Amino acid sequence: QVNSGGRNIYYYTHVLMADGLHTDAYIDYVLGFYDKCVNKTDLSAVSAAVEPDETTDAEQTLAYMDIHDSVDQLTWGNLNPQIYYKPTPRIREINENTATLTMDYRIASLTDSGETELYNVHESYRVRYTDSRIYLLNLERTTDQIFNPENSVLQDNGINLGITDKDVEFVTDEENRVTAFVQENELWTYRRLDGTLTKVFGFPQKENMDYRDFYDAHSIHILRVGREGDVWFAVAGYMNRGLHEGENGVAVYYYEAASSTVNEEIFLSSMESAEFLKRDVDSLAYISQDGSRFCVLLEGNVYQIDLNSRTYEVLVSDVAEDCHAASQSGRYFAWLPQGDAGDSTALNVLDLETGATQEITCGADERIRPVAYMKEDLVYGVARAEDIDVSHGGNGIFPMYRLTIRDGEGNTVKEYEPAGAYVTEVEQSDNMLTLTRVVKNGDVFAEGTEDHI
């Protein structure tokens, strides 16, 4: 415990005292495997460790690799990486027989035109110790290119982000003049009229790098983009630098394009872990049209913060897990006030811009739940109570005989009620819903065909 600035700061660590954990052997193994891949040496050892199968090199991308990829893919293919920042292994789990370790590091590579490109790499290893050797049980590697506007990134059909996850967060203004996007936890804007790229926010520094540049326990959430390039955004999780360095919380910022300044509007300190904070803000974060109010889901409550008076109120309390959904903009928030995803007869929808709440109900012998949002339209499902079986927790079944798509004004956009089929799961991808369906044979449900909306 340390007292700083009139407050107590608590530090903790977990010390494991045990014999025969083979810690040195595990660390040597993962560092050795990483070194062989980067330097393309001892390829026979890499080959002996991996497990190619029918999925080998299926994606043909360096953005994601695993134990089932080829030796060529795992040793970076045509890329000739150089170590830019060395890894430090972290032990996540360990016992006498197995261990899970992760590593984060940065590599550099030259393009054919002589440009230097930097990549952040995250690796996760699952290994097993035997007296004769160490076995690689699982390996996953993700690679994300660090955006550099000085390289040839502007193309006729858009911005080339290089090797990275396909799921990139971006928001445009209403006239599509300015686009804000997040790449490797850095926020950028792109002005279409003149092709200007501007870095708005990011903890990493170009010079005097240290571990704070690589500690990835926060996320950036774009809230709104104005037509002149102004951006409202939130940062959730652990604060690597700045006034709140070392704290967990949610910071709301306003970027004014005309002056190229970033102002902190408010910081909400939290005792939640960085992982939970990121999850909460992913679930709901909204800034009002006039920029005076910020709404966010934190620790099971929906808060509205007045950014002028620095006061807050709780709009919704005790929001249960798996009992809520928010629209793409965050303006609409749907939740089950009864707090039971398998036994609720009412669904509320709150318009965070106007403060108005709508209630959607089902019959007494039916149950309702929010499924997803398609942009600003709510998708909810209704099941017959007699068909529901949630006695096995996550393995239960909630067979919805009807799905309804409803806009923010409360108008029904579409109803989906297939004859003889029930929807049990919904997966959203862009503007399409993939429906997992079952059919009923007597009192038993059997696997059915997939459908789409």
Could you tell me what each predicted segment is?
Residues 190, 195, 246-260, 347-354, ...:
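Beta-propeller blade signature
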